Amino acid sequence: MPDLLSIYAESQPDKPAVVDDRGGGDVVRWTYAELEAEANRLGNALVSLGMTHGEKVVWCGPNSRQVVAVVNAARKAGAVAVPLNYRLTPDEALYVIDNCDASIAYVDAEHAPMFAALRDRLGKLRQVIVYGGTPPAGMLGDDFVAGFSPKPPEEAEEENAGATMIYTSGTTGKPKGAVRRGRPGDAAVVGLLGLIGYTPDDIYLTSGPLYHSGPGGFMGGALALGQTIVVQRKFDPEDWLRLVDTYRVSSTFSAPALIRMACSLPPDVKARYERSSMKRMIANAAPWSLALKQQYLADFPEDSLWEVYGSTELGVNCVLEPKDQLRKPGSCGKPAPGVEVRLFDAAGDEVTGTGPDHPGELFVRSTVVFDEYYKRKQSYDAARRGDFHTVGDIAYRDDEGYYYICDRKNDMIITGGMNVYPAEIEAVLEQHPAIYEAAVFGIPSDEWGEAVHATVVPRPGASLSEQDVMSFSREHLAGYKTPRSVSFADELPRTGSGKILKRVLRAPYWAGQGQIA
């Protein structure tokens, strides 16, 4: 299996690989030779701790040069890299770490105390390596890693090398580990990067959290081409513009909610920063409204906006090119290179008609589709139809072959680029002693695209306020999953079979929004 990082470390050793810019002059640059050495030291450290091929190393922390290193180190050691969302509560994190059977954890110092508190409940976790600060008692630190050789570890077995596992919640509310095995030189990936126009000379800015498949995947593509990657630790709109200006950024991947923040800055603030270098704004994670597209195109080069549709499990499935952004508003584009898309109706028949009156569940076939849900074969099989796989989105196709996502079969909410699954929140809310049942769904939000809303049925005689519900949620859920608003009802609308009619609940909020409720 070719190790592109090692190749670039030899062919362009002095080229900047990672620029970790935290603002205020706090900047650390690693060349390709330095990134290779750091990844090798960490890979050798993992091997020294008994990590064998196919074992899991979970990493946790905001965007940083160390995150870039650990992803490569895991691959070099033949391990499976598992990103952990650092915004999860301890109980949520515990489930992921335990379920993936992690052997080693690589954690930034800020989140090391959470791992220390959970350590006694994680019998399969052998050791924790802490970076960027002093480790708690019983854990290892940067000095441990620094003592290892900068030469590559023994070559990993091809079966496991380059594998990743990213957790994505499902309709049960429990996260599922989507495993994708390494496929160097995959034709679909190469075709996508070629279509978008990636070049080795690009300066790529990563600002979305790298524990997500989109930011992590496109950063991986940039690294595979030998680009320079600028890392923003956490998104801040003006700082994002500063980075674009300072480094003459030409490519980036972002959620619409983040770009809305940047484009909504006062004109005098935006005027301080040069933006003409941007050639490829790759957008995903939520639909772009026509108004936001127009706002973006007024602030950035008009041929720079690329919209992609995909998921953690299925990779990139459709692409809307710059020339179609205003011509095809609401579309997610045509199938990406190497991707075959089909629509099936509820009876399992393929939908051949076009237009909004002919929707179907969207299935794809591609070499970039994930390989399994870890320990969840039944869930994996249930989402397949032969060689085609679905995540439950409902779509239609127009006469020119462009696809439009019109509903989410599983009611997933996308708020600020974060995937939120109502079943998980409902399960938490219904633990409140005053709540009889709850229905959670997304409502329009100018700031976040969608906001989490809960409709709650109180228990008879119970006294319950909106603040009570929100406070309880904050205690048990990550902040982005907490409902932003709450309404109360005597009962929830249901079908004849007893299923809650969330479409009925959503409809008043989405009226006039141009989207199917």
Regions inferred by a protein language model and the residue ranges of each:
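Conserved AMP-binding A3 loop
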Residues: 29-33, 163-187
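A short helix-loop-beta submotif of the ANL/AMP-binding
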Residues: 56, 62-82, 86-90, 98-104, ...
